[in-house]
Amino acid sequence: MTRIITKNSSTASAIPLAGDLVQGELALNVTDKKLYTKDSGGAVVSVGTPLDENNPTAADTVTLGLWAGRYIGPNNIQNTFIGSGAGASFSAGTGRSHVAVGHDAMALATFGTGHVAVGENALLNISGTNYATAVGTDTGVNCTSGGQSSVFLGMLAGSQVTTGAQNVCIGFNSNPTSATSSYQFTLGHTDITSLRCNVQTITSLSDARDKTEIVDTPYGLDFINTLQPRQFKWATRDGNIKDGKVEQGFIAQELLAAAGDNKADLNLVLEENPNKLEASAGNLVPILVKAIQELTAQVEQLENN
């Protein structure tokens, strides 16, 4: 049976000395009703109530671990911090309804509502945003004023994000185009070479009731003839698994040149990160259909003559 001893103190949040406890013993501070124990490493940790050096009245908050919720203030309510350093910096801030589990999870966070951080350093620096979910070591570790309503799943997922919001990153080291990118969904990192599913296309919104100024596309055969389909061998600057592989496709810079002043309408290249251009060849499908229609008309005209 675990022995419970009492530590009488006139100072709220006074912590028992490690030498006063045997491993596994519980110590109760009768002044502020905080409970402590000594872990296997010889450190004194709080159990069930916040280890609070600023205010003992944070409502409905539970902490477990050395310095978990260490500086929690009176406006930081309904939080759960489990693990050494988890949620340690909530003091003057108004963070509430957070769950941080793991060493230094949300350790430097101060403001916000409803974050879930599971894993060492998960959402370490996040402040001023709400409702981010990060599961895995170092997920969203560099988010500062970003991460709003984002989901990071897998070690280092979203680790490069700083101010970007409403991103979804799934898989090891998966990240958006840039640290400030928002509204992106990223599956895996740059070494992923196959996207497998039981269907071959992604269904997107195309309802006429959600569109206006509908006209026939002005782009067709003439534009298609300006494109340069290429064969190339990958030699990535970051040295990933695709290096040496031969593929067919387009060059982003050549697509931009073909689009000219109409690149915004055609949306063939994502330029958000100028150091890593990304092509959306699928946006050529409507133009290819128009080109086929124009060719069909030419063939029919020749046949009729």
Indicate residue ranges for each PLM-predicted region.
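Acidic glycine-/aspartate-rich tracts in secreted/extracellular proteins
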Residues: 32-33, 40-42, 261-262
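Short polybasic amphipathic segments
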Residues: 35-37, 185, 195, 232, ...
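Glycine- and small/polar-enriched repetitive beta-structure motifs of secreted/surface proteins
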Residues: 49-206
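Intramolecular chaperone/auto-protease modules of tailspike-like proteins
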Residues: 205-305
